Amino acid sequence: MIPDISEALSWLEKHPLAVKGIQRGIERETLRVTANGHLATTGHPEILGSALAHPWITTDFAEALLEFITPVDNDVDHLLTFLRDIHRHVSRNLGDERMWPLSMPCFIDSEQNIELAQYGSSNIGRFKTLYREGLKNRYGALMQTISGVHYNFSLPLSFWQAREGVADAESGKKAISAGYFRLIRNYYRFGWVIPYLFGASPAICSSFLKGRETALPFERTEKGMLYLPYATSLRLSDLGYTNKSQSNLGITFNDLDTYVAALKRAIKTPSEEYAQVGMKKDGRYLQLNTNVLQIENELYAPIRPKRVTRAGETPSDALLRGGIEYIEVRSLDINPFSPTGVSESQVRFLDLFLIWCALADAPEMSADELLCTRKNWNRVILEGRKPGQTVGMRCETIQQPIAEVGKSLFADLRRVAEVLDAENSQPHYQQVCDELLVGFDDPETTFSGRLLTLMKQEGNGSVGLSLAEEYRKMLSSEPLQVLTEEQLAAASEHSWQRQRQIESEDTMSFDDYLAAN
């Protein structure tokens, strides 16, 4: 069953200030599409600023794949309003284009039409585009156009002071990092609850497969939509962004030094498969290198330990310097029922669940045990809503119904919710528990259940198009609430100045820059 955390919950009830001041951030990806849903072939709109240097509006893999990044925030309402303001501003500046509201792309005629994100003529800009060229040549461009939401989360220092007895972040970095690794291990064990409740990619357009082999038993509608009747998140399946060559890297989440050493090993380990791609063709680079990972960010993971990097610092060097500062949750599909791709209920649920993961005991896990947890994720991803579906506990030695495990978990989450609500004198967190608990008795009320019902009636392309148009009208007509037009114009202008400055300060050739990095 789930770990017994009654003692930890009693401790939390006695130390409510330990969870006052949680910091959060959201990153939301979305494809720019035309009125008929096809991938936009236009460049990143100049009015939105430089994708290289803008603090809030950038691009991910493709020139048409927008990414919105909120600043760190300790207020849920303000965080979501800021994100919505970015959406409002972008909606007003996309002309007749709109933002695709689903994780899975639909109307992409050919991978050749997917232009890689462009970041200007500086070495760092060209490096970023070449990294994407490598991703395209390794995994195919289509897979890289799948969109998601990332949720960044950190517990306040007061939590670690009360729980672990640390004095400050610097002297306590070992204990704090160990605490975040415990959270991560619990996330691997129980994080399947996220795609169960919020997975929103139960179907794909048949064009997405394009002759690719799949052993998945898809059902097909008359309109050509492919779906699995009980699937929750095909984005998280092997059809989505996974890297099979990474599964034997032996990366574990038991302590910082071992984790970083394994990560550094992966970026130095040559790959026979990627060596066959080659480094150059007709004088043009094809990837940054031929190692298993070109850079650390290529590591696929449903959750990542993070620290803000300094200039010239790799993510792992930042972790070694200061320990884990926050974690990045990467298992959220785009929420099609929200104009901004994520809702307040989801944010509040993640707060509760991540606090639970930090409180619950989590024995160290070997690489094999981590692979074992993947079985539960796969079961939920492909057949999560199947009546009587079970998850395996203790590496598959015990099977328990999802509904039973989910309800036990929510009994704990409600106690965490009461602590958080007492601080705000509003029952927001408890309301989220009530709202989501229903999904364990009636899986059709989950995001994937609701969405698949809609898609079977109208087709997934039609659902995407009508939601995109509805949200375009809604967002472009709403006034800004926390940002101003002046702030947005200044951020855009400053980002272009910064890009020009970076370009003018380059001193070495791109070949030399690559060799040095």
From Swiss-Prot:
Catalytic activity: L-cysteine + L-glutamate + ATP = gamma-L-glutamyl-L-cysteine + ADP + phosphate + H(+)
GO biological process terms, semicolon-separated: glutathione biosynthetic process
Class of enzymatic activity (EC top level): ligase
Pathway: Sulfur metabolism; glutathione biosynthesis; glutathione from L-cysteine and L-glutamate: step 1/2
GO MF terms, alphabetically ordered: ATP binding; glutamate-cysteine ligase activity; metal ion binding
EC number of this enzyme: 6.3.2.2
Keywords: ATP-binding, Glutathione biosynthesis, Ligase, Nucleotide-binding
Any Gene Ontology CC annotation: cytosol
Pfam family, any one: Glu_cys_ligase
HAMAP family to which the protein is assigned, alphabetical: Glu_cys_ligase
Family, as annotated: Belongs to the glutamate--cysteine ligase type 1 family. Type 1 subfamily.
Protein name per Swiss-Prot or TrEMBL: Glutamate--cysteine ligase
